[in-house]
């Protein structure tokens, strides 16, 4: 099948005859569907993504529930057709035969990293690189993964960029600057500066949640979460003992958040790649770890005033969330610095 015609299916619904014809053409047996669990407290829709593939044909199609894709309320999940959002073309991949059809942009599975970059040179200003390379075309985003050494293509993934969430319909309160937030790290809950900065966002109504969980969750609508802690050696939490440990800033849709509307430390942007982070921080991270099970990574930079913790996506090579952490927080390891879950 011509790759241009195949990629034209991105954005179409699973009930579209052209989509069904394509799945039949590649002998894909399963059909996309949301996962339902009526007994799950977060259900009944517990998974809005669905992937269907033919391993023998080396191709896989990804779909998402239409309501989830367009950012509608969770009560709408499962009531709309699913949107085709991505297509994988596999090369040297465990358990999957190589795709035998034409690849987009004249790519070949035998191409090495340098050749792939040359063939996609027209999109060079959009390239984000790390373990994989990612480019933006006018219609979609393409990610190319390589075998060890970059000698040939492991897979090429073409995916739609997520649409923006629907507008809120009301104005947000002004958010404090990142400089102001950093200055408050380690401050006690009764510090007037804490309330000057965060009361306009609704901090007072989260007092009980802070006492119970140590967290103030402003992810929706502010893209912000605050972690508080009680210093070691104390037992009963209180305003004079509870201190601001960290602040985490979220990209849109990350952990159900809306985008943090303020600035980020060191001029970081949510669209930055891991390579761009090193340039902006001025040096490699002090600690770094990638998790290929969920295609994310985390990097830490320690400074006397605060620690910067960045979680990024290794499939699209973009920052997902950024945390600033008090220097005396006791959090010196990566495993404890992923922010609120």
Regions found by a protein language model. Name each.
Residues 170-181:
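N-terminal low-complexity, Pro/Thr/Ser-rich intrinsically disordered segments
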Residues 96, 256-257:
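Preference for well-ordered, secondary-structure-rich cores of eukaryotic proteins
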Residues 2-5, 18-82, 91, 103, ...:
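A cross-family detector of function-defining hotspots
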Residues 100-105, 182, 261-266:
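Short, recurring structural edge motifs at helix starts
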Residues 3-9, 178:
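Amphipathic/hydrophobic helical signal segments and adjacent flexible N-terminal regions
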Residues 241-246:
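Aromatic-anchored, charged helix-turn/loop surface patch used as a conserved interaction hotspot
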Residues 88-92, 248-253:
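Eukaryote-biased recognition of intrinsically disordered, low-complexity regulatory segments
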Residues 9, 181-186:
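Interfaces and regulatory segments of ATP-dependent nucleotide/adenylate/phosphodiester-chemistry enzymes
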């Amino acid at each position: 099948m011509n790759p241009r015609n195949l990629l034209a299916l991105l954005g179409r619904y699973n009930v579209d005859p052209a989509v069904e014809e394509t799945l039949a053409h590649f002998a894909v047996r399963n059909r996309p569907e949301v996962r339902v669990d009526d007994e799950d407290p977060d259900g009944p829709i517990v998974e809005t993504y669905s992937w269907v593939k033919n391993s023998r044909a080396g191709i896989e199609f990804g779909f998402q529930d239409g309501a989830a894709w367009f950012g509608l309320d969770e009560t709408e999940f499962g009531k709309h057709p699913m949107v085709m959002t991505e297509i994988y073309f596999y090369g040297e991949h465990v358990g999957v035969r190589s795709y035998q059809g034409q690849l987009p942009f004249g790519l070949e599975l035998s191409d090495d990293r340098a050749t792939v970059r040359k063939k996609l040179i027209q999109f060079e200003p959009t390239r984000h690189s790390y373990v994989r390379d990612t480019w933006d075309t006018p219609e979609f985003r393409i990610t190319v993964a390589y075998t060890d050494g970059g000698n040939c293509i492991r897979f090429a993934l073409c995916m739609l960029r997520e649409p923006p969430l629907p507008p809120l319909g009301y104005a947000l309160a002004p958010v404090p600057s990142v400089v102001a937030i950093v200055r408050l790290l380690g401050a006690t809950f009764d510090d007037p500066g804490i309330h000057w900065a965060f009361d306009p966002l609704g901090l007072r109504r989260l007092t009980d949640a802070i006492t119970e969980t140590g967290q103030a969750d402003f992810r929706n609508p502010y893209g912000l979460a605050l972690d508080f802690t009680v210093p070691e050696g104390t037992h009963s939490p209180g305003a004079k003992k509870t201190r601001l440990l960290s602040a985490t800033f979220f990209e849109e849709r990350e952990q159900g958040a809306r985008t943090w509307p303020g600035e980020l430390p060191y001029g970081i942007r949510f669209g930055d790649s891991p390579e761009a982070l090193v340039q902006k921080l001025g040096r490699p991270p002090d600690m770094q770890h990638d998790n290929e099970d969920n295609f994310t990574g985390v990097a830490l930079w320690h400074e006397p005033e605060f620690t910067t913790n960045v979680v990024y996506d290794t499939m699209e090579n973009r920052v997902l969330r950024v945390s600033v952490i008090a220097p005396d927080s006791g959090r010196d390891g990566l495993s404890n610095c992923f922010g609120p879950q």
